[in-house]
Structures are given as C-alpha cells and as structure tokens.
C-alpha cells in the first residue's frame, strides 16, 4: 500500500476542508478532488484489501501499476460479492476481483459532468487521471457533500454579515 502524493491540479488557497477559497467558483473536478490517495497494487491480497478498507474507513480504493497508472477499482460491494461467492479467499489477489471497466474523469472535467456520470452509473467515486491514465486523485460523493457544505456555509455567512448602511444619493 502506498500514499500517492501527486498534486498536479488546481492551485489556490484552501480552507479547512481542503476546498478552494478566495472568490473563485468551484467548477472542475480538480477544484474539489482528493489528491492524496492511498492505493494498492493488483498483487496485494484480499486480506490486505479488507484491512485497508477497515483501517481507513474507505468504501473503495484505487489499484495502480508500478508506473502509477490506474488499472482497477475495488469497492466494498466487490468485496461483499467475493465473500458471498467464495468462502475461502486465502491466496486471492486484488487483481482477481477488482473492477477493470473503469469510468474516469480528468482534473479539468466540469463538476456537473462528474456528478452526472456518478448518478447515471450509480457509483460513489470517480478516479481522476491525466491524459496518460496516471492517477491524479479521486472524487467521491463525500467530496461533493463537503463542497456543498462549504458553499452553504459561505452563503450563510454572507447573508448574516452586517450590511453597510445604505446612504441615499444627494442631489447637488
């Protein structure tokens, strides 16, 4: 298991939730994605996959090759399906049960397009890759909820801030 520290996405000031601040609208996946992703190799064991999910409270993780190219995704549903089908999973590697039919986005993908993909495919995460399929990050339903919360809090704070008294224009 390794932490992917690659960070080639949008720049700017980040708030405590890791979301951009400073007046720029959050419009792309790169603005809100999780950049520091813990990944696994296709050769890791089923047991290691379960340990990773339990330790980090993940519902899914990304599988990359030695060159950091995305090769698969494992979800908690994939693990449950494997457990239902095969009672003894000793010796089973991640490559035997990871999803290979990958639905991805790039850091420049518009948020509305990413949400549409997640809703239409009924998935809870999208791996974020560059043009050569190198992993840049992940965007999850939790990332969207954090973004929404941050936007709501910002709107509420603006609504609650004292407004400067309006002075009528005087005619000369």
PLM ranges: what are they?
Residues 1-172:
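Tandem CBS (Cystathionine beta-synthase) repeat/Bateman regulatory domains
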């Amino acid at each position: 298991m390794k932490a992917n520290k690659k960070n080639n996405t949008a720049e700017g000031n980040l708030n405590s939730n890791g979301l951009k601040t400073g007046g720029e609208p959050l419009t792309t996946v790169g603005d809100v994605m999780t950049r520091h992703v813990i990944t696994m190799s296709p050769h890791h064991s089923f047991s290691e996959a379960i340990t990773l999910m339990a330790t980090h409270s993940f519902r899914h993780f990304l599988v990359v090759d030695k060159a950091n190219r995305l090769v698969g995704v494992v979800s908690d549903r994939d693990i449950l399906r494997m457990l239902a089908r095969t009672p003894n999973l000793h010796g089973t590697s991640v490559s035997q049960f990871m999803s290979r039919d990958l639905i991805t986005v790039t850091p420049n993908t518009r948020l509305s397009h990413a949400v549409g993909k997640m809703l239409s495919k009924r998935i809870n995460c999208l791996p974020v890759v560059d043009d050569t399929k190198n992993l840049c990050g992940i965007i999850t339903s939790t990332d969207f909820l954090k973004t929404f919360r941050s936007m709501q809090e910002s709107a509420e704070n603006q609504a609650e801030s004292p407004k400067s008294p309006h002075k009528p224009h005087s005619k000369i």
